[in-house]
Regions:
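An N-terminal, well-structured beta->alpha segment
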Residues: 1-82, 88, 169-204, 212
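N-terminal small/polar loop signature for handling phosphorylated ligands or for N-terminal nucleophile
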Residues: 58-128, 219-304, 423
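Active-site phosphate-binding/coordination module
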Residues: 106-162, 297-300, 398-401, 465
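Phosphate-binding and adjacent anionic-ligand microenvironments
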Residues: 292, 296, 308, 314, ...
């Protein structure tokens, strides 16, 4: 079998285990046959990418490669191995230790590094880890063509040779400098919109997800006007365990009963939100004070807002679509662009979110899932703004020919769907290098200053419903100020809160909290995950994909509607069907493999009027996915089946659901993903029982065997 690409949406992630505990002889075979990342894999992966940059003449010997991580590697084995890979390749490893992803990528830009490695599995469970890569200068993440080259390089390397290779690159620790830079960056009023006075009287519960923000967040949030309670700041308790954004995805409000007795029992942040809200209930009912929450993910690049509603005694969850809408409204109030500003979101977003921002004056664009595609748009439009500035200043025919060549190459890259971040970055840099060599750095710096002005940069907002909201920021390096676009959970939180405080009514009312929950006429939105899958079964041309496509088309035969199958340039593997009414989008239904977790999902988006149709469709398609796409060789899938069998005849306690043959898997994770994510089982007190969906899956599975 030809292996083209081992990465997912955002780098590579998976369950981690020390090499000595695996049966494979080398890190690649362990990954391919056991689906496990070892510390040796981390060394091989960073070495391979540094070699890629050196051979592409993007880096030279002893150039810098920044590396940092979230706190999940408690032993340090994986972190140290990744550092060794950098040094064996001949680059200088600039270690910044535990910092949020935005701080690491920012420091890479600050020191002019060739790349940055972030060792994290983001919102994934604590038993997993991974590697994100940012390319120097552009700060782009790797695209599919980059991933393919890196995959082939990893497959061709002999780890035994690498094991004995010398450490020829240097090592330095810049943690203090990188930490200081990020604190100063976030304190700069240019980089968030929040006025400290607007926090007066607020209580803010901050959930660091036991992740990368844990050792830093109290120094970042030092506004004296607000009262802070910091939760989940102890990595020893497990990153993302009953904390962070992942379990809040798709949730718009959480009742008091769910927090005290139900699905969210034991979630410290939610418990404190409820307790603090009830303590101040009378005060909250009669003025504009709020009990708020900031919830980050493990590596700190995204955020959800929480707000206690005293009228309903519940906690509202403000996701990415809603935060982006609030931020867009505030931007529109504060700026007049030279062109219509651009709002970018992904296919996961509510269809009505795009329509809502169009109505307030934005041009909209939809891209594939993953903030790397949003970063691409921000980088491309930033480059275009600089190019227009240069063209107004430079008459030389040589420059005009060069810029036309670069533009043509980038257009061809997009049209061919061969997205290549290193190729794009080198092209961006070629123009800047020409200006620097032939005219001088002063013009380059003035172009940076020009595009740092929001009205000159038409990229306004990039948004994912998962809580990535990306807007323009500015980084000062010496006498140069340059634009920066980074997924930054804290910046997102502060900007969203600033927008809400400006746009809101003066006094708390039931209508205010309803507006906070739903500021635009929302559509129908449902995402149904299937865990422990064989992702190859969704490949183009596979029998199951064809069967799934036919099943979708048969069940989307709605009156007076047309259906079109759409192939996204950025993610051709996704099966996407648009439903049109009078030629206009009415619904979108798609199935895609997750690029960050061991799962696939069915996504349904559409107008509220189509809710019954879409729910009926889900009832037919979701069981098919649950039954057909599980990876029969996955220990998690096998354990899941055993749990269903154990519960077939009645409720059981946790002790009755453990299996000696699956001692290495996390039972807590398994039960969590079977219950809160797939709805196959449910918990009542200290017992577990099978749901109707679980029983259907079990019955059909037994029949097929």
């Amino acid at each position: 079998m030809t292996i083209e690409r081992i990465q997912g949406t955002d780098g590579i992630r998976g369950i981690v285990r020390l090499a000595e505990d695996c049966s494979g002889s080398d890190p690649i075979s362990v990954f391919l046959h056991e689906a496990v990342l070892t510390e040796e894999f981390f060394e091989l992966y960073t070495y391979a990418y540094c070699q890629e940059l050196l051979e592409a003449d993007f880096a030279s010997a002893n150039d810098l490669a920044v590396i940092g991580w979230d706190p999940r590697d408690m032993s340090g084995s994986f972190n140290h191995s990744a550092i060794r890979g950098i040094r064996k390749a001949g680059l200088t490893a600039v270690v910044v230790d535990i910092l949020p992803t935005p701080a690491i990528s920012l420091y890479q830009l600050h020191v002019g590094a060739a790349c940055a490695f972030v060792l994290t599995a983001s919102h994934n469970p604590a038993d997993q880890n991974g590697i994100k890569i940012f390319i120097g200068h552009s700060n782009l993440k790797l695209f599919p063509e980059d991933d393919k080259r890196l995959t082939q390089r990893c497959l061709s390397l002999n780890f035994e040779n690498l094991r004995s290779a010398p450490l020829i690159g240097e090592l330095r620790n810049d943690h203090a400098a990188a930490r200081k830079l990020f604190i100063e960056f976030m304190a700069d009023p240019q980089n968030h919109w929040l006025n400290e006075d607007s926090l007066a009287g607020a209580k803010i519960i901050v959930d660091a997800a036991n992740g990368a923000f844990s050792p830093l967040i109290e120094d970042l949030l030092n506004y004296e006007s607000a009262d802070y309670i910091f939760t989940n700041c102890d990595p020893a308790q497990g990153i993302n365990v009953r904390s962070g954004v992942a379990d809040l995805e798709g949730v718009s409000s959480i009742s008091a009963d769910e927090i005290e007795n139900g699905l969210f029992s034991g979630y410290e942040t939610l418990e404190k939100m409820l307790a603090s809200g009830r303590e101040q209930k009378e005060k909250l009912l009669n003025n504009s004070c709020q009990v708020l929450g900031f919830v980050f993910d493990g590596d700190g690049d995204r955020c959800f807002l929480l707000c206690y509603d005293p009228f309903q005694d519940c906690v509202l969850v403000v996701g990415g679509d809603t935060q982006a809408f609030f931020q867009a409204k505030l931007l529109q109030q504060n700026y007049s662009w030279n062109q219509v500003p651009l709002f970018v979101n992904t296919v996961e977003s509510d269809l009505e979110a795009g329509r809502a921002v169009q109505q307030i004056g934005f041009e909209t664009m939809q891209c594939a899932v993953g903030d790397k595609w949003i970063l691409w748009q921000s980088c491309f439009y930033d480059w275009q703004a600089k190019l227009e500035y240069y063209l107004n200043k430079i008459a030389a025919s040589q420059f005009r020919i060069l810029q036309e060549q670069v533009r043509t190459r980038l257009e061809q890259m997009v049209q061919s769907t061969k997205f290549d971040a290193l190729f794009a970055t080198k092209n961006f840099m070629s123009l800047e290098k020409w200006v620097s060599n032939n005219i001088g750095d002063e013009l380059v710096n003035s172009a940076y200053a020009h595009v740092c002005q929001q009205q000159n940069n038409i990229f306004a907002i990039g948004s994912e419903e998962s809580g990535h909201v990306i807007t323009l920021a500015k980084m000062n390096s010496g006498h140069v100020t340059r634009p920066v676009f980074i997924g930054n959970g804290l910046k997102c939180a502060l900007n969203s809160l600033a927008a809400i405080q400006v746009l809101r009514t003066v006094k708390n009312t039931p209508e205010f909290f309803e507006w906070l929950k739903c500021p635009f006429p929302s559509g129908f939105k449902k995402s149904l995950p299937v865990y422990y899958v064989d992702k190859s079964l969704l490949d183009e041309g596979s029998v199951l994909r064809t069967e799934l496509e036919e099943l979708l088309l048969v069940n989307l035969n709605w009156p007076e509607m047309e259906v079109e199958i759409v192939k996204r340039q950025e993610e051709p593997e996704m099966l996407l069907l648009n439903v049109l009414e009078n030629g206009l989008p009415a619904a979108a239904v798609f199935v895609r493999n997750s690029g960050t977790e061991d799962k696939m999902a069915l996504y349904l988006r559409g107008s509220k009027e189509l809710k019954v149709h879409l729910e009926s469709l889900a009832d037919k398609i979701y069981p098919f996915l649950l039954l057909s796409f599980k990876n029969k060789n996955s220990p998690m899938a096998q354990a899941e089946q055993l749990v269903l069998l154990r519960l077939k005849d009645g409720a059981k306690q946790v002790i009755d659901l453990s299996f000696e043959q699956f001692a290495k898997i996390s039972l807590n994770r398994l039960l969590h993903e079977m219950s809160s994510r797939q709805q196959l089982i449910k918990q009542e007190g200290d017992t577990w029982s099978i749901t109707e969906t679980g029983r259907i899956c079990l019955t059909n599975s037994e029949r097929s065997e």
